Amino acid sequence: LYTEIETDDRKSGEKQFDYVDPRNRAVQIEMEKICTAHLKRIGAWLKPEFKDPDISELGVQEFPVTASVVIPVFNRIRTVKDAVESALSQKCDFPYNVIVVDNHSSDGTTGLLEELSLKNDNLIHVVPAKHDLGIGGCWNLAAHHEMCGEYAVQLDSDDVYSGPDTLQKIVDAFREQKCAMVVGTYQMTDFQMNPIPP
């Protein structure tokens, strides 16, 4: 494809959110064009033409709850408690649970989640049998878990919901739009919840 020599010597944490910096928009657009051209050249590009999802089964199949907040986690002792508590504090007109898939954390995350799950009946702490799942494998495990709800809603282990009605709004959007996926926005903050401008 191409070779790029790294000239940015900042630590990774300092450049973590460069992708949302408006000053980098031109580079992002250029990279998107390059990737699109490559996919077209190798016959792997998919035209953005999508059929409406088949929702005839919605509401027919039995689920243990309406929604599950899915949190994949690995070694996030500093942030996962806030994420879990944010999910557990949602106010909804439907039953929901929180499924945390702990990918064999070694920093105390596992013990913390075990403690939290003893105090919260709707918190399901899953440690997979396999050690090599990664974030996608953890997501897949949660989506196929017997306690997963009709709607699986992502929350990263270092994120919190912006308010107690966020989950309700997401499920309302699923229902009203009869869609297979809902994508929202987020606000970057520091650990004191102060917004970080792009």
Model-derived segments and spans:
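Short, acidic, metal-binding catalytic loop of nucleotide-sugar glycosyltransferases
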Residues: E85-P95
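Non-catalytic membrane-proximal stalk/linker segments that position and tether the catalytic domains
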Residues: Y2-T66
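Short aromatic/hydrophobic "clamp" motif used to bind/position activated sugar donors
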Residues: A152
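Short beta-strand/loop segment that forms part of the nucleotide-sugar
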Residues: P95-H104, V127-A129, D156
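Active-site beta-to-alpha loop of glycosyltransferases that engages the nucleotide-sugar donor
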Residues: I71-D82, H104
